[in-house]
């Protein structure tokens, strides 16, 4: 059985990790959310989240977006390529309900899988 934990090794923790992704990212996005990705040499994917107060005013909305994004990543982690991902929430993401946000994330994960196979 595949383990679906979300340990510390699967997170981008330092500013240097985020900068690495921002330097030469592969982009996949919708009007409300963008996922930047860059191949890593670790053999497993990692994720970092940026949900700015400027774009999502209420803390409980920011927390909901981060929670759903982490859960989506956790469930797909074994299907994703060995990349570092940064999820950037844009204006309007708070207007999406849980189902719409989950579907948007699934679509973006699939797009990143295709991009990684193509490169």
UniProtKB/Swiss-Prot annotation:
Catalytic activity: Endonucleolytic cleavage of RNA, removing 5'-extranucleotides from tRNA precursor
UniProt superkingdom: Bacteria
GO function terms (MF aspect): 3'-tRNA processing endoribonuclease activity; ribonuclease P activity; tRNA binding
PROSITE patterns reported for this sequence: RIBONUCLEASE_P
Enzyme class: hydrolase
Enzyme Commission number, as recorded: 3.1.26.5
NCBIfam families: rnpA
Organism field: Salmonella arizonae (strain ATCC BAA-731 / CDC346-86 / RSK2980)
Entry similarity comment: Belongs to the RnpA family.
Record-given protein name: Ribonuclease P protein component
GO BP terms: tRNA 5'-leader removal
InterPro entries: Ribosomal_Su5_D2-typ_SF, Ribsml_uS5_D2-typ_fold_subgr, RNase_P, RNase_P_CS
GO CC annotation, single: ribonuclease P complex
Record keywords: Endonuclease, Hydrolase, Nuclease, RNA-binding, tRNA processing
Stated role: RNaseP catalyzes the removal of the 5'-leader sequence from pre-tRNA to produce the mature 5'-terminus. It can also cleave other RNA substrates such as 4.5S RNA. The protein component plays an auxiliary but essential role in vivo by binding to the 5'-leader sequence and broadening the substrate specificity of the ribozyme.
Oligomeric form and interacting partners: Consists of a catalytic RNA component (M1 or rnpB) and a protein subunit.
PANTHER family: RIBONUCLEASE P PROTEIN COMPONENT
